[in-house]
């Protein structure tokens, strides 16, 4: 079994590679990654010497490079994690998101059509559904919820999802799609809420919180997400969408305060900044379908997952301190310096 994992040097992709090589030692895993700002080759250091692992630096939009890789490897399965994923960056430069998230997906599916695969899996997001009102805690996103995007990022992911389903209907490509809630855990790039707050706390820097911090997110530990995708690519029904939720809804401000408490830092570090444009209020996923069909449920409670995550950042300062130097500092000042 050969699996191409695109975006495998990023947060979720790298965790998925670790999971698959550990669980299926006979599988061959090929990572294709462009190594943008969010891709870090050092993340893959634990598997670089594994004889069943190969890393290829390439852009999923590079048709020649993608087709060459398929010619060499003849993969059985393709799992596409490769994406521009940060909402704030999509507001600053939407074009990059459209190119990578939609056109890159099209390139991968064209390669799958030419070389033949048993499964193409698209890793997507609950953000394609838009948001839910704070005063309706009884409402959840299901796979039947209409697409109603709020940002250039979510629009690009929705466009890719629709393209994947169209390739299934038009060309009978064997596809599946998963839409997950917010992930957290090891190797998370420190522009996202949880790793940003941990890093800033450890450096006694201000903790920028959008608006009043009342936005609610459903949090999914990355290892649980990887196990769900593992199930889908092996047992999921072709042509189907599966929602993957963590059953861990929390307000942003409560998460930030919890991180302060765990690290023994004062809440006075919290700084409220101008809210994000079009900021979604609440995400909440109903994972009934994946539970009933594939037997998956999240295993990690948020209280346990956040402790493990914080400890990982304490134990791996060199990894994230290297990341937040250079270009990231320029981006950070641009996003939060004058808000």
Protein language model regions, located:
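N-terminal Rossmann-like NAD(P)+-binding domain of SDR-like oxidoreductases, especially those catalyzing
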Residues: 1-183, 308, 313-316, 322-339
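C-terminal substrate-binding subdomain of Rossmann-fold SDR/epimerase-dehydratase oxidoreductases
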Residues: 3, 29, 58, 195, ...
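Residues that form or flank phosphate/diphosphate-binding pockets in enzymes
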Residues: 12, 38-39, 64, 188, ...
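Short histidine/acidic/glycine/proline-rich micro-motifs that form metal-
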Residues: 35, 182-185, 215-216, 276-277
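A glycine/serine/threonine-rich, flexible loop-to-helix segment
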Residues: 47, 135-136, 190-198, 274
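Residue-level recognition of oxygen-bearing side chains
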Residues: 65, 96, 103, 146, ...
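The catalytic Tyr-centered alpha-helix of NAD(P)H-dependent dehydrogenases
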Residues: 137, 149-156, 186, 190, ...
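Hydrophobic alpha-helix immediately C-terminal to the catalytic Tyr-X-X-X-Lys motif of short-chain
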Residues: 159, 163, 167, 197, ...
